[in-house]
């Protein structure tokens, strides 16, 4: 293969398609224009979505581009693998009603082999399961059938980008890199093919045959014109053509690494060499492996951050900005492995800009602003990072000293609550120290803290301001999550205090604050109040007589009246509150629109984890109604309505149709929140700026809190992802446990009732939701219900089959039969046998009695069983004994009367039962005596 630079590969590709009459279209921004369903531009076709659907007039019918893209779905593995990046460039060629499959396949193969220089003999191809046409075309182009694989929808059906748009089956080109790149089992198994998880086959070109338009409900409609959408990752193509070990060893990324080498004094090649040594009991190799990952992470993240800020996406506490902030903080943390203790990312801006400025000149114009922004973010994070890292080192050492291998959830929560360490960051750090992370324990601690803040601090708010001079608190939180304020009141143990010291719990009142106090259903904010080393952790925020009280505890230092504090709200938590509060408004709008104006709000809880909404409605919602409501809310999210807030005289607010909360008291002026045509409500809470920020909405549960009212519990945004991840994790466990039980207890006989559902994993769930939005919500709802139904059906079939097998084993069990005969009574006319068992149904007793009668001609069988809630009895006899006067039906009726139940039957077979199972022994004994009297004439 030809060894070309990244810029040469880019130009070869674009010029090839330019010669094929394609318009060369510049890359669009990483900020998707007019598409609220996407956080970032994630593929080359994003800017062409309207052209595929025919929504706009075509300026051209074929195009080519090299598109800037940003994806964070695989963030945790970036730096650890040889091919994952968050930022990358996507080469692509596109047809809008022009050419289709044959030309697209021909272009892909011709460009790959004859212009880029790929070895045709090493190219493998995948096609969609039933795409015979594509396979036939590939064969005619010289790709043998044995190098063409058919894969399903997960691998070979693409799109849309977002929750609606063009989509269709696809065909991918893979390069066989040799058996040495395969996994441990691939070399010996001989089954390694495209689609295998190893690195032997690397996909480098994807051709999507756009034939459908998917609406927001997930329905597919034929496109008026078919289209072609191809994607070829530039960095990945460079990896293959340059024979590099990873994308980070390609020429452009390797140049960025060289800048870090200069700053750190550490040589990347030395790190790579040392990292290949066995890491077991080799500290040098482990350090090198960590440094290798660090070089790669900071190299990747600087590109993502630089290009994002260059396109106007600045670090923030929410949405896209939060992703960029997280990338900067992650890079800062990894930079410590390269001995960077001070801000360093900003120093690379000018040098990285020089690499990409020829292709993206806008970077040069914005480099100063980019540099300044990154420096400010690094300085902000480094303020708390040092203390947090010292603490985590202590906690890791404590864990290891105690002989444990799991880093406790309680310790992780301490880092989260005190130092602001995200759980995923702690997990990465402790993993490097060889410790597992107790996710469940962390979640439990998180929940306990929430419960504590909801209950403990609520009790303290009662009448704290009674007798105090009241100064109304100025609320800053609509526009900011941080700000300065002076202490005007302090409370300790429900009493006014002059100071609060380390370890003490209490409440602080500031003259102004960004902390939102509980109200309108929205729970109070949490966060920190700081002055230097004086730190007060806010666990809850409440309001009394227009005064906002911050309840919590002093973590360090001391607080006194008149101190000026820096107040900082927990941003990620507030973001989720905004999602759920705005989602609640849309839900209220959906209910009133779909169910009627009789719907009145009866109660509401807006928490970071979920929303709960009580409303007046006479009957339970049907499954169809729930889906309609969910769809209505998601459609309002998709429309990305601006969220407008304004203060109005209450009468003016009523005139514009603002909905008030039933039973709530309002002043002369009210705050109104409007979301397009979807919702207008009185509300003092915090909200998103556009409904599209919410992402998606899912109804978890519908129930009744009381007569005449209904309750909906739902989730928005990231909580939807977590809900489905938890739901499918539970389903996975249920499927595995059930299948294991079926296999172990039924052997081969249970193979037909095994649950064969393909349960999606957490990464797949996140990626699909982030990519497809509301469509994925419906998909996962349907899939989870389908799998749950399969589990229920298989469980029922398992119990039935197990019971049948147990019954069969019981009926034919020789030892049981011998035991029953061992206690037989010979009357001289015929034998009477009886027995009492536990938990046997009448059919099992009947089967056993039939087998007993086979052994003896003149036989009366009386069998009983004590079950969980009752007793059952079966009496049968041979025809010879019927002729002697035995009537099984009469005997059963007698027994059942003593059991407090009913029964009956024919002379030779009868059955019955009753709830008074404690009488079973005496009842059967009495039946034996009656039968003996009938057969022998002896009186009972």
Swiss-Prot record:
Family matches, as InterPro entries: aa-tRNA-synth_II/BPL/LPL, Ala-tRNA-lgiase_IIc, Ala-tRNA-ligase_IIc_anticod-bd, Ala-tRNA-synth_IIc_core, Ala-tRNA-synth_IIc_N, Ala-tRNA_ligase, Ala_tRNA_ligase_euk/bac, DHHA1_dom
Binding site for Zn(2+): 581, 585, 683, 687
Alphabetized SUPFAM superfamilies for the sequence: Class II aaRS and biotin synthetases, Putative anticodon-binding domain of alanyl-tRNA synthetase (AlaRS), ThrRS/AlaRS common domain, Translation proteins
Domain of life of the organism encoding this protein: Bacteria
Major enzyme class: ligase
Keyword Acetylation: no
Enzyme Commission number(s): 6.1.1.7
UniProt xrefs under Pfam families: DHHA1, tRNA-synt_2c, tRNA_SAD
SMART domains reported in the protein's UniProt record: tRNA_SAD
GO MF annotations, alphabetized: alanine-tRNA ligase activity; aminoacyl-tRNA deacylase activity; ATP binding; tRNA binding; zinc ion binding
UniProtKB keywords: Aminoacyl-tRNA synthetase, ATP-binding, Cytoplasm, Ligase, Metal-binding, Nucleotide-binding, Protein biosynthesis, RNA-binding, tRNA-binding, Zinc
Cofactor(s) required, per the database record: Zn(2+)
Entry's cofactor comment: Binds 1 zinc ion per subunit.
Stretches assigned to coiled coil: none
Gene Ontology cellular-component annotations: cytosol
Main location (coarse class): cytoplasm
Catalytic activity: tRNA(Ala) + L-alanine + ATP = L-alanyl-tRNA(Ala) + AMP + diphosphate
Family under the similarity heading: Belongs to the class-II aminoacyl-tRNA synthetase family.
Domains (record comment): Consists of three domains; the N-terminal catalytic domain, the editing domain and the C-terminal C-Ala domain. The editing domain removes incorrectly charged amino acids, while the C-Ala domain, along with tRNA(Ala), serves as a bridge to cooperatively bring together the editing and aminoacylation centers thus stimulating deacylation of misacylated tRNAs.
Protein name (database record): Alanine--tRNA ligase
Protein species of origin: Leptospira borgpetersenii serovar Hardjo-bovis (strain L550)
């Amino acid at each position: 293969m030809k060894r070309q630079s990244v810029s040469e590969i880019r130009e070869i590709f674009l010029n090839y398609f330019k010669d094929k009459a394609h318009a060369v279209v510049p890359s669009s921004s990483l900020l998707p224009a007019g598409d609220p369903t996407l956080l970032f531009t994630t593929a080359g076709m994003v800017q062409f979505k309207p052209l595929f659907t025919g929504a706009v007039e075509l300026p051209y019918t074929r195009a080519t581009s090299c598109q800037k893209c940003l994806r964070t779905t695989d963030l945790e593995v970036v730096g650890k693998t040889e091919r994952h990046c968050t930022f990358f460039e996507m080469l692509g060629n596109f047809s809008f009603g022009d050419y289709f499959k044959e030309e697209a396949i021909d272009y892909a193969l011709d460009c790959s082999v004859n212009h880029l220089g790929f070895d045709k003999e090493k190219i493998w191809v995948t096609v969609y399961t039933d795409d015979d046409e594509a396979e036939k075309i590939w064969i005619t182009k010289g790709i043998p059938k044995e190098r063409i694989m058919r894969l399903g929808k997960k691998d070979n059906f693409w799109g849309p980008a977002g929750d609606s748009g063009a989509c269709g089956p696809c065909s991918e080109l893979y390069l066989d890199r040799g058996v040495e790149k395969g996994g441990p089992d691939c070399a010996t198994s001989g089954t390694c093919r495209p689609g295998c998880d190893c690195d032997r086959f690397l996909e480098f070109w994807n051709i999507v045959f756009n034939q459908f338009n998917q609406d927001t409900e997930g329905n597919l409609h034929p496109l008026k014109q078919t289209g072609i959408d191809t994607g070829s990752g530039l960095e990945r193509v460079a990896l293959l053509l340059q024979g590099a070990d990873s994308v980070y060893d390609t020429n452009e990324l390797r140049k960025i690494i060289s800048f870090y080498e200069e700053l750190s004094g550490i040589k990347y090649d030395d790190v790579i060499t040392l990292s290949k040594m066995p890491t077991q009991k080799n500290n040098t190799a482990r350090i090198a492996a960590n440094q290798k990952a660090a070089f790669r992470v900071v190299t990747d993240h600087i590109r993502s951050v630089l290009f994002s800020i260059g396109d106007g996406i600045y670090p923030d506490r929410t949405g896209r900005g939060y992703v960029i902030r997280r990338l900067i903080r992650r890079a800062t943390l990894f930079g410590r492995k390269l001995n960077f203790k001070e801000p360093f990312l900003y120093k690379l801006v000018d040098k990285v800009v020089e690499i990409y400025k020829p292709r993206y000149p806008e970077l040069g114009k914005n480099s100063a602003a980019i540099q300044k922004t990154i420096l400010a973010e690094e300085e902000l994070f480094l303020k708390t990072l040092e203390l947090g890292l010292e603490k985590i080192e202590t906690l890791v050492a404590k864990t290891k000293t105690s002989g444990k291998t799991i880093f406790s959830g309680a310790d992780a929560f301490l880092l989260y609550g005190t130092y602001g360490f995200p759980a995923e960051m702690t997990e990465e750090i402790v993993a490097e120290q060889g410790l597992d992370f107790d996710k469940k324990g962390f979640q439990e601690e998180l929940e306990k803290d929430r419960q504590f803040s909801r209950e403990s601090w609520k009790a303290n708010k009662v009448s704290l301001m009674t007798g105090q001079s009241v100064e109304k608190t100025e609320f800053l939180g609509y526009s900011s999550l941080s700000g300065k304020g002076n202490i005007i009141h302090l409370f300790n143990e429900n009493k006014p205090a002059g100071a609060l010291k380390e370890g003490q719990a209490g409440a602080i009142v500031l003259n102004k604050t960004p902390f939102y106090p509980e109200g309108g259903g929205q729970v109070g904010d949490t966060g920190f109040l700081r002055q230097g080393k004086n730190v007060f952790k806010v666990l809850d925020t409440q309001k009394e007589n227009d005064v906002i009280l911050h309840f919590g505890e002093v973590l360090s230092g001391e607080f006194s009246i008149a101190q000026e504090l820096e107040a900082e709200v927990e941003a990620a938590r507030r973001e989720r509150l905004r999602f759920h509060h705005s989602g609640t408004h849309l839900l209220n709008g959906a209910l009133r629109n779909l169910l009627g104006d009789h719907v009145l709000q009866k109660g509401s809880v807006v928490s970071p984890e979920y929303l709960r909404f009580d409303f007046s409605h006479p009957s339970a919602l049907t499954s169809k109604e729930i889906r309609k409501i969910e769809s209505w809310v998601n459609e309002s999210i998709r429309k990305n309505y601006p969220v407008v807030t304004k203060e109005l005289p209450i009468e003016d607010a009523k005139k514009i149709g603002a909905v008030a909360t039933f039973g709530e008291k309002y002043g002369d002026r009210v705050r109104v929140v409007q979301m397009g045509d979807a919702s207008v409500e009185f509300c003092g809470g915090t909200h998103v700026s556009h409904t599209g920020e919410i992402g998606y909405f899912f109804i978890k549960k519908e129930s009744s809190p009381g007569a005449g009212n209904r309750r909906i519990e739902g989730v928005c945004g990231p909580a939807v992802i977590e809900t489905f991840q938890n739901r499918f994790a539970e389903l996975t466990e249920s499927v595995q446990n059930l299948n294991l039980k079926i296999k172990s207890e039924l052997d081969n006989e249970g193979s037909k009732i095994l649950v064969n559902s393909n349960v999606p994993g957490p990464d797949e769930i996140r990626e699909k939701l982030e990519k497809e939005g509301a469509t994925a919500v419906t998909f996962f709802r349907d899939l989870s219900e389908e799998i749950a139904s399969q589990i229920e059906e298989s469980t029922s079939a398992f119990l039935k089959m197990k019971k049948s097998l147990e019954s069969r084993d019981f009926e034919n069990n020789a030892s049981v039969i011998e035991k029953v005969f061992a206690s037989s009574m010979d009357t001289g006319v015929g034998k009477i046998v009886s027995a009492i068992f536990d938990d046997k149904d009448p059919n099992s007793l009947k089967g056993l009695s039939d087998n007993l009668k086979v052994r003896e001609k003149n036989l009366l069988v009386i069998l009983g069983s004590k079950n969980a809630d009752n007793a059952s009895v079966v009496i049968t006899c041979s025809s010879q004994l019927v002729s002697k006067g035995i009537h099984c039906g009469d005997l059963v009726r007698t027994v059942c009367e003593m059991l407090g139940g009913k029964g009956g039957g024919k002379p030779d077979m009868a059955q019955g039962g009753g709830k008074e199972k404690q009488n079973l022994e005496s009842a059967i004994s009495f039946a034996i005596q009656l039968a003996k009297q009938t057969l022998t004439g002896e009186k009972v």
